[in-house]
Amino acid sequence: FREDEQLDERPVLALLAGSRRQEIKDNLPTMLKVATAYPGHQPVIAGAPGLEPEYYRQYIGDADVKIVFGKTYPLLSHSDAALVTSGTATLETSLFRVPQVVCYYVAAGRLASFIFRHFFHTKYISLVNLIAGREVVQELFGVRFSYDQIHDELGRVLNDHAYRSRMLDGYDEMIRLLGKPGASRRTAAVSYTHLRAHET
Protein backbone atom coordinates (compact mmCIF):
# COMPACT_ATOMS: atom_id res chain seq x y z
CA PHE A 1 0.00 0.00 0.00
CA ARG A 2 2.68 2.50 0.98
CA GLU A 3 4.65 1.80 -2.18
CA ASP A 4 1.57 1.84 -4.42
CA GLU A 5 0.50 5.23 -3.05
CA GLN A 6 4.05 6.62 -3.01
CA LEU A 7 3.98 7.34 0.70
CA ASP A 8 7.16 8.25 2.53
CA GLU A 9 8.50 6.70 5.72
CA ARG A 10 6.51 8.91 8.13
CA PRO A 11 3.66 7.35 10.14
CA VAL A 12 0.30 7.77 8.40
CA LEU A 13 -2.48 9.99 9.75
CA ALA A 14 -5.79 9.00 8.14
CA LEU A 15 -8.43 11.65 7.44
CA LEU A 16 -11.96 10.30 7.06
CA ALA A 17 -14.02 13.41 6.42
CA GLY A 18 -17.32 11.85 5.41
CA SER A 19 -19.00 10.92 2.15
CA ARG A 20 -21.22 13.91 1.31
CA ARG A 21 -19.94 17.11 -0.28
CA GLN A 22 -21.39 19.37 2.42
CA GLU A 23 -19.99 17.16 5.16
CA ILE A 24 -16.54 17.26 3.57
CA LYS A 25 -16.76 21.01 3.03
CA ASP A 26 -17.63 21.55 6.70
CA ASN A 27 -15.05 19.20 8.21
CA LEU A 28 -12.06 18.72 5.94
CA PRO A 29 -10.52 22.23 6.07
CA THR A 30 -10.15 22.12 9.86
CA MET A 31 -9.01 18.50 9.78
CA LEU A 32 -6.33 19.41 7.22
CA LYS A 33 -5.16 22.40 9.24
CA VAL A 34 -4.76 20.21 12.31
CA ALA A 35 -3.11 17.34 10.43
CA THR A 36 -0.50 19.52 8.75
CA ALA A 37 0.44 20.96 12.15
CA TYR A 38 2.03 17.57 12.88
CA PRO A 39 4.72 17.30 10.17
CA GLY A 40 6.08 14.10 11.68
CA HIS A 41 2.99 12.34 10.31
CA GLN A 42 1.82 12.01 6.71
CA PRO A 43 -1.86 12.94 6.22
CA VAL A 44 -3.79 10.72 3.81
CA ILE A 45 -7.43 11.38 2.91
CA ALA A 46 -9.84 8.50 2.32
CA GLY A 47 -11.66 9.76 -0.78
CA ALA A 48 -15.41 9.19 -0.90
CA PRO A 49 -16.98 7.10 -3.69
CA GLY A 50 -18.33 9.22 -6.53
CA LEU A 51 -16.14 12.23 -5.81
CA GLU A 52 -13.19 13.26 -7.95
CA PRO A 53 -9.67 14.16 -6.78
CA GLU A 54 -10.20 17.75 -7.97
CA TYR A 55 -12.94 18.22 -5.39
CA TYR A 56 -10.47 17.50 -2.60
CA ARG A 57 -7.64 19.51 -4.13
CA GLN A 58 -9.58 22.75 -3.69
CA TYR A 59 -9.19 22.21 0.06
CA ILE A 60 -5.70 20.70 0.01
CA GLY A 61 -4.04 23.44 -2.02
CA ASP A 62 -0.26 23.09 -1.86
CA ALA A 63 -0.24 21.01 1.32
CA ASP A 64 1.64 17.71 1.32
CA VAL A 65 -1.45 15.51 1.57
CA LYS A 66 -2.30 12.34 -0.37
CA ILE A 67 -5.76 11.11 -1.41
CA VAL A 68 -6.69 7.46 -1.92
CA PHE A 69 -9.93 6.09 -3.36
CA GLY A 70 -11.42 2.68 -2.69
CA LYS A 71 -8.68 1.86 -0.20
CA THR A 72 -10.06 2.93 3.16
CA TYR A 73 -9.31 -0.40 4.81
CA PRO A 74 -5.71 -0.61 3.53
CA LEU A 75 -5.30 3.00 4.65
CA LEU A 76 -6.53 2.23 8.14
CA SER A 77 -4.37 -0.88 8.36
CA HIS A 78 -1.30 1.32 7.78
CA SER A 79 -2.36 4.28 9.97
CA ASP A 80 -0.92 5.42 13.28
CA ALA A 81 -3.98 7.56 14.11
CA ALA A 82 -7.06 9.05 12.44
CA LEU A 83 -9.31 12.09 12.38
CA VAL A 84 -12.82 10.81 11.72
CA THR A 85 -16.28 12.30 11.29
CA SER A 86 -19.09 10.47 13.06
CA GLY A 87 -20.78 7.45 11.49
CA THR A 88 -19.75 3.95 10.55
CA ALA A 89 -16.20 5.19 9.87
CA THR A 90 -15.65 5.50 13.63
CA LEU A 91 -16.55 1.83 14.07
CA GLU A 92 -14.38 0.75 11.14
CA THR A 93 -11.45 2.73 12.53
CA SER A 94 -11.81 1.05 15.91
CA LEU A 95 -11.97 -2.42 14.35
CA PHE A 96 -8.59 -1.69 12.77
CA ARG A 97 -7.38 -0.61 16.23
CA VAL A 98 -6.42 2.86 15.07
CA PRO A 99 -6.57 5.54 17.81
CA GLN A 100 -8.90 8.29 16.63
CA VAL A 101 -10.35 11.72 17.24
CA VAL A 102 -14.03 12.05 16.31
CA CYS A 103 -14.73 15.56 15.03
CA TYR A 104 -17.90 16.78 13.39
CA TYR A 105 -18.92 20.31 12.46
CA VAL A 106 -22.50 21.27 13.25
CA ALA A 107 -23.92 24.61 12.11
CA ALA A 108 -24.99 26.89 14.96
CA GLY A 109 -22.84 24.80 17.25
CA ARG A 110 -24.07 25.95 20.63
CA LEU A 111 -27.72 25.42 19.78
CA ALA A 112 -26.96 22.06 18.18
CA SER A 113 -25.06 20.89 21.27
CA PHE A 114 -27.91 21.94 23.56
CA ILE A 115 -30.54 20.20 21.45
CA PHE A 116 -28.46 17.02 21.13
CA ARG A 117 -27.76 16.74 24.84
CA HIS A 118 -31.30 17.53 25.98
CA PHE A 119 -33.65 16.07 23.38
CA PHE A 120 -31.97 12.98 21.90
CA HIS A 121 -31.96 9.96 24.17
CA THR A 122 -28.32 9.14 23.58
CA LYS A 123 -25.13 10.57 25.03
CA TYR A 124 -22.85 9.98 22.05
CA ILE A 125 -22.57 10.53 18.30
CA SER A 126 -19.96 7.87 17.44
CA LEU A 127 -20.82 4.21 17.06
CA VAL A 128 -17.76 3.28 19.12
CA ASN A 129 -19.07 5.07 22.20
CA LEU A 130 -22.69 4.13 21.54
CA ILE A 131 -21.87 0.43 21.43
CA ALA A 132 -19.47 0.57 24.38
CA GLY A 133 -21.96 2.61 26.40
CA ARG A 134 -19.22 4.93 27.57
CA GLU A 135 -16.69 7.42 26.23
CA VAL A 136 -13.93 5.45 24.55
CA VAL A 137 -13.00 8.21 22.09
CA GLN A 138 -13.37 11.98 22.37
CA GLU A 139 -16.26 13.48 20.38
CA LEU A 140 -15.52 17.04 19.30
CA PHE A 141 -18.72 18.37 17.77
CA GLY A 142 -20.88 21.45 18.18
CA VAL A 143 -19.09 23.97 20.40
CA ARG A 144 -16.19 21.53 20.85
CA PHE A 145 -15.41 21.46 17.12
CA SER A 146 -12.49 23.87 16.94
CA TYR A 147 -8.93 23.83 15.66
CA ASP A 148 -7.50 24.15 19.16
CA GLN A 149 -9.49 21.31 20.70
CA ILE A 150 -8.94 18.93 17.77
CA HIS A 151 -5.23 19.82 17.65
CA ASP A 152 -4.78 19.19 21.38
CA GLU A 153 -6.69 15.92 21.33
CA LEU A 154 -4.74 14.65 18.32
CA GLY A 155 -1.51 15.53 20.11
CA ARG A 156 -2.64 13.44 23.05
CA VAL A 157 -3.59 10.53 20.79
CA LEU A 158 -0.23 10.66 19.01
CA ASN A 159 2.06 11.22 21.98
CA ASP A 160 0.45 9.95 25.18
CA HIS A 161 1.13 6.21 25.11
CA ALA A 162 -0.98 5.48 28.19
CA TYR A 163 -3.92 7.35 26.64
CA ARG A 164 -3.55 5.39 23.39
CA SER A 165 -3.44 2.15 25.36
CA ARG A 166 -6.65 3.00 27.24
CA MET A 167 -8.39 3.77 23.95
CA LEU A 168 -7.30 0.44 22.47
CA ASP A 169 -8.54 -1.31 25.62
CA GLY A 170 -11.88 0.41 25.04
CA TYR A 171 -11.91 -0.90 21.48
CA ASP A 172 -11.33 -4.42 22.81
CA GLU A 173 -14.22 -3.99 25.24
CA MET A 174 -16.49 -2.84 22.42
CA ILE A 175 -15.42 -5.76 20.21
CA ARG A 176 -16.25 -8.19 23.03
CA LEU A 177 -19.70 -6.64 23.27
CA LEU A 178 -20.14 -7.11 19.53
CA GLY A 179 -19.25 -10.78 19.95
CA LYS A 180 -21.98 -11.53 22.47
CA PRO A 181 -25.33 -13.12 21.50
CA GLY A 182 -27.66 -10.60 19.92
CA ALA A 183 -24.78 -8.40 18.79
CA SER A 184 -26.09 -7.97 15.25
CA ARG A 185 -29.49 -6.86 16.51
CA ARG A 186 -27.92 -4.55 19.08
CA THR A 187 -25.57 -2.97 16.52
CA ALA A 188 -28.43 -2.49 14.06
CA ALA A 189 -30.53 -0.80 16.74
CA VAL A 190 -27.67 1.48 17.74
CA SER A 191 -26.97 2.34 14.09
CA TYR A 192 -30.65 3.09 13.44
CA THR A 193 -30.86 5.37 16.48
CA HIS A 194 -27.66 7.11 15.40
CA LEU A 195 -28.89 7.69 11.86
CA ARG A 196 -32.32 8.94 12.95
CA ALA A 197 -30.69 11.37 15.37
CA HIS A 198 -28.66 12.89 12.52
CA GLU A 199 -31.30 13.07 9.81
CA THR A 200 -31.51 16.47 8.11
Regions found by a protein language model. Give the residues of each.
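Nucleotide-activated sugar donor-binding and catalytic core shared by glycosyltransferases
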Residues: 1-196
